[in-house]
Structure formats: structure tokens, C-alpha cells
């Protein structure tokens, strides 16, 4: 089954320097990202691990954003074509996240990471799509992978920010707006 069958999340770090040596690997990844399954010989393998791609930009983000001829995915290998990128649900810009520093660390009690990991694992089994659909409707122009990416991102944000399952309409709107912004960055 590989990594996607054994883990909840498979992260690829430094994807900007990633070399694709097997041309079939990208097609397998596309199928998995679209359907949650891939073929291994004559067997269909189902898995539900999330894929995370982490990397750096090769130039300042201000230059990329200001130039209409560039995009945020330029550092990816050419094999990561539009069909692969369109399967990404969300683009989280690292430049908007504060860098680790002593000022954000504590010398008081903190979360035990294995406990947090188990809590997140339990939350993966929950579906929070109903919270969104009960309060908001995506426009008719939002369909297919766009709608799926937005709904899945909202569901994930609700689990992280409101694990108890209760949020106000304004809090839900905040998650929806963030999900739409992250999906627009993919496009």
C-alpha cells in the first residue's frame, strides 16, 4: 500500500528541487489525488492519506505576485503540470506565517505532540461538510475540484479551530473565506 496506506499525512519537503525519475509516478499521484486510489498491478488500492507539498520560492514572493507571467508554482518540476496543481486543495503562503523564534516558544506547559496527533487523527474521521452547507452556498460557478477543495479545507479548519464542533456563523464565514482564498491561489 505504500506510505499513503499507512499514514494520515504524507509530506514532500523541498519540492522545488524534486526530480521525477519515473514518469508513471505523476500519473499515479494524479489518480490518487483525484480518487483516493491507485493501481498496483491489477489491484486497486484505496487510501485516505493527505498529501502535503512543502517548498521554497526561488525569488522574492513580491516579484512573483507582481508579475503576471509568473506563478507561485514555478519552483515545481515541469512534470507537475496543471492537472496535478489543480488537484491541490489549498496554497498556504509561508511568507504569511511567522518564523519560529524564542518569542513564540513557552517555558510553561504545552501540548504533548503525541496526544495532539491522536486528537487530530480522531478528528479526521469526522465530516464537517454539513456545517458549511447548512449556512452557506457556493456560487454556481464554483464546481468540481474547486468546490471539493473549498469544502475539504473548511472541514479541516473547523476541526482544527473548533474541535468541539460548535462555531458561530461568523466563524464559519471566516473559515470559508480563508478556504476560498487558498483555493484561488491554486488557480
Please annotate each region the language model reported.
Residues 3, 21, 25, 80-84, ...:
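Helical mechanochemical/support elements of P-loop NTPase systems and associated helical scaffolds
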Residues 26, 66-70, 105-109:
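Short secondary-structure boundary/capping segments
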Residues 6-32, 46-49, 56-67, 83-84:
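Conserved AAA+/SF3 P-loop NTPase catalytic/coupling segment centered on the Walker-B
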Residues 3-15, 87-98:
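P-loop NTPase motor core
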Residues 39, 53-56:
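A conserved active-site cap/scaffold subdomain adjacent to cofactor or substrate pockets
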Residues 89-187:
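Conserved NTP phosphate-binding and transfer environment spanning the P-loop NTPase/kinase superfamily
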Residues 65-99:
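A short helix-turn-beta junction within AAA+ P-loop NTPase domains corresponding to the substrate/partner-engaging
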Residues 1, 34-49, 65, 72-80:
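Conserved Walker
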Amino acid at each position: 500500500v505504500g506510505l499513503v496506506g499507512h499514514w494520515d499525512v504524507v509530506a514532500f519537503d523541498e519540492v522545488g528541487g524534486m526530480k521525477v525519475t519515473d514518469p508513471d509516478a505523476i500519473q499515479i499521484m494524479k489518480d490518487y489525488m483525484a480518487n483516493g486510489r491507485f493501481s498496483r498491478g491489477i489491484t486497486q488500492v484505496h487510501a485516505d492519506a493527505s498529501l502535503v507539498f512543502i517548498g521554497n520560492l526561488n525569488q522574492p514572493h513580491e516579484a512573483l505576485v507582481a508579475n503576471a507571467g509568473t506563478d507561485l508554482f514555478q519552483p515545481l518540476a515541469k512534470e507537475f503540470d496543471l492537472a496535478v496543481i489543480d488537484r491541490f486543495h489549498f496554497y498556504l503562503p509561508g511568507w504569511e506565517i511567522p518564523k519560529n523564534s524564542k518569542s513564540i516558544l513557552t517555558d510553561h506547559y504545552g501540548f504533548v505532540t503525541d496526544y495532539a496527533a491522536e486528537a487530530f487523527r480522531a478528528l479526521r474521521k469526522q465530516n464537517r461538510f454539513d456545517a458549511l452547507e447548512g449556512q452557506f452556498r457556493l456560487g454556481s460557478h464554483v464546481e468540481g475540484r474547486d468546490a471539493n477543495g473549498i469544502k475539504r479545507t473548511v472541514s479541516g479548519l473547523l476541526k482544527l479551530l473548533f474541535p468541539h464542533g460548535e462555531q458561530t456563523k461568523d466563524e464559519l464565514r471566516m473559515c470559508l473565506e480563508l478556504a476560498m482564498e487558498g483555493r484561488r491561489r491554486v488557480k
